[in-house]
């Protein structure tokens, strides 16, 4: 009986919180704070133990990882846009190195103790939106469902 009571209380609390939660999650400041919290947890529990190894502490390793991330990102995006006409819907396969490069750059940023900024988050959202747009039907046609850009973001993206 007490289990049913706890479930009803939990659903009542959820129904009270949920309408405001969606609006709060649209705020870029909240998104960046949430990302920094998750990155902080990852830094303490995953990154710091890895960083104590001698090879990761070397500057050569860090520079190599940054260069590798940039090369993967640029090569993946370039191949996607250059070969999309010839490959059609299969051109999205070239986004795999770009996504790996993006993840590598973000991980390197975390390893170098730099927090996520609103600019980095906007760049990441734009790249994820473009990736989703290509992955869903092989074309860039703003058919995103998950990573959508607000009208203010799309106007600032077209202005720059």
Swiss-Prot record:
Query: Where in or outside the cell is it found?
Result: Membrane
Keyword Membrane included in the entry's annotation: yes
Question: Which cellular component, as a GO term, is one annotated location?
Answer: outer membrane
Keywords from UniProt, A to Z, are: Membrane, Transmembrane, Transmembrane helix
Entry's Pfam families? CRPA
Source organism's superkingdom?
Bacteria
Q: What is this protein called?
A: Sulfur-rich protein
């Amino acid at each position: 009986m007490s289990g049913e009571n706890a479930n009803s209380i939990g659903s009542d609390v959820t129904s009270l919180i949920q309408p405001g939660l969606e609006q709060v999650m649209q705020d870029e400041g909240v998104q960046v704070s949430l990302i920094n919290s998750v990155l902080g947890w990852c830094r303490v529990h995953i990154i710091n133990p890895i960083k104590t190894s001698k090879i990761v502490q070397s500057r050569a390793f860090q520079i190599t990882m940054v260069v590798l991330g940039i090369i993967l990102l640029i090569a993946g995006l370039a191949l996607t846009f250059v070969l999309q006409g010839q490959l059609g819907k299969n051109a999205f396969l070239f986004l795999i190195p770009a996504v790996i490069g993006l993840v590598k750059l973000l991980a390197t940023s975390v390893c170098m103790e730099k927090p996520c900024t609103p600019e980095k988050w906007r760049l990441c959202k734009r790249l994820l939106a473009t990736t989703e747009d290509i992955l869903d039907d092989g074309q860039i046609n703003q058919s995103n469902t998950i990573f959508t850009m607000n009208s203010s973001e799309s106007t600032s993206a077209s202005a720059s």
